[in-house]
Amino acid sequence: MTDFLIQNAKGILTGHEGAGARRYGDIRVIDGMIAEIGALEASPGEKIVDASGCVVTPGLINTHHHLFQSVMKAVPEGMNEELAKWLRLVPYRYWDRIDEEALRVSATIGLAELVLSGATTVSDHHYLYSPRYDFDPVELLFETAGQFGVRFVLCRGGATRGRTFDGDNTTPLPTETLDQMLQEVGKAARRWNDPAPNAMRRIVMAPTTPTFSLADGELKEIAACARGLGLRLHSHLSENTDYDLYTKERFGMRPVEWIAQHDWLGPDVWFAHLVTCDPEEVRMLHQSGAGMAHCPQENARLGSGVAPADMLAELGGAVSLAVDGAAGNEAADMITALYSAFTIHRAVKGAGALTAERALSWATAGGARVLGLDATGVIAPGKAADLVLFETHSPRYFGQHDPLIGPIVSGGEPKIRRSYVAGREIVRDGKIPWLDMEKLAADADRVVRRLAQT
């Protein structure tokens, strides 16, 4: 069903900021697109979706994740460690035990968690490509995402050199030559990449880091290859002071200055984290059009700090919201990410640092902007019908004078009456209709036991 009329909602949060942030009325969807908004009469035979007691928002857009980490939550050894040691004790410790079953189960867990929190678009930064694999991780991830019906952006990661840590006894991450990496990205792009503004599938060029994962001089070639293929660029940057120290010691400059010299700034580039950027780096990001995948919960959990997302947003820069891998936050859902952003910036900058409407815009319009999915991210005629109906009939929301912002400012596990991608229903009454949760729980337990025992 891609034609229907949503009626009786409490209100609509459009994904815009300012005067256009709210609308009231009905939403008509035709051929998976938003056709009209207002006081609308049902046409004869038109399907009606009753949104009584619901707030309607655009589908939420997660711009940075590592789905393979969804079976690595709450590993005791890594719970109280900062980034470098956590990497060694958790994802780098387990990566070589992630076989086809483990990746499929992990991706299913992560996608279910996201979809049940209102996500309709997921960008996953996957960087595990071992020659030992007898399966294709790219194909597996697209197939799994296809079951959920979400828009899926696969950021094809990888490294040409490994990273070692003090006291390292982990299996090194798999590496490949630069030619191998570029050939594999090109192959994936030819099969999966759709450049349309309402694409369901995208490929992005995404080396694991521009600093620790590549040999000097490779960044420019990677950027040129990506742009030649019509692909966007993504990576981690400035997640903590390790990045600052690395570029200062090796190149005598800060991370954003350094990547700017290697053609890694522009409106087709976005970075996860950017926690330690100084004001000049933020200005450079804004002027170039490069975007941020803001990961507030992950950065807080690992003690990395708070990214200057508010500073970039004030300049008019591209800020999006992301959950990052579940191994480093234990709750990789979009409502927790929204609530974390809303509260953390106020803790640092004061009560006026971030409004609910701006936080939502990062999770919707901002996500569409950094991913280049311009037909999504806001509720307006002519946009894709990626829509979420959040129920507010819960003690969590009772007593609120402004009922529209409840899903953002109250946190907690939401109840979604309906969720749509291009007008196709993916959630009904708080459930993913096709997904057997009991089986998924058993699969998760089996995989976790195997990871812990080997």
PLM feature spans:
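Metal-coordinating catalytic core of metallo-dependent amide/deamination hydrolases
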Residues: P131-A272, E280-V282
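Active-site gating loops and adjacent loop-to-helix segments of metal-dependent hydrolytic enzymes
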Residues: V71-L103, R161-L178, T241-G266, S288-G291, ...
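Divalent metal-coordination and catalytic microenvironments
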Residues: A9, I27, G32, G53, ...
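Alpha-helical scaffold segments that flank or form the walls of functional sites
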Residues: A74-H125, Y129-R151, Q183-N198, D445-Q453
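His/Asp/Glu-enriched, well-ordered alpha-helical/loop segment
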Residues: Q261-D268, D310-S394, S410-G411
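Glycine-enriched alpha-helix->loop->beta-strand junction motifs that scaffold or abut catalytic
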Residues: A223, R227-R232, W264-P267, M284-A293, ...
